[in-house]
């Protein structure tokens, strides 16, 4: 009997000690980044994200750019088409308010390129922007 109880305790310990996948978390499986450098020093960047997006309202890219660079020409699209670019992104918007929209959020260390998840599940996002020299 003592062996059986010890075995059950061991099973419980192992059950909770083994990391299990988080079923509701977002997972970017691949990111493909291409950059085109112009003669004036500016750069056009295209990022393609593929993954499972199953929680939250938005995804974002922290952009800790130096003061002499600005971000322009932001566009985001997914498998269903292009998003609307809004001038003032609000991180507190609801899922519905962020759906099919993208924008910039100012932070203490730079910017965040933000876009609404729009649909839970497998998604394919294309994020494009230009880094300009002031």
What is each PLM-predicted segment?
Residues 20-134:
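Lumenal/extracellular ectodomains and adaptor appendage modules
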Residues 1-9:
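Bacterial N-terminal signal peptides that target proteins for export
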Residues 9-19:
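Bacterial N-terminal signal peptides
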């Amino acid at each position: 009997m003592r062996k059986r109880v010890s075995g059950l305790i061991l099973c419980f310990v192992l059950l909770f000690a083994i990391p299990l996948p988080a079923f509701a978390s977002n997972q970017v499986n691949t990111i493909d980044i291409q950059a085109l450098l112009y003669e004036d020093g500016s750069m056009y960047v295209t990022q393609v994200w593929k993954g499972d997006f199953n929680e939250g309202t938005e995804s974002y890219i922290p952009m800790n750019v130096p003061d002499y660079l600005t971000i322009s020409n932001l566009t985001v699209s997914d498998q269903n088409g292009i998003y609307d670019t809004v001038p003032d992104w609000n991180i507190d918007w609801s899922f519905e308010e962020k759906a099919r929209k993208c924008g910039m959020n100012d932070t203490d260390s730079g910017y965040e390129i933000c876009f609404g998840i729009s649909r839970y599940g497998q998604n394919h996002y294309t994020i494009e922007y230009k880094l300009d020299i002031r």
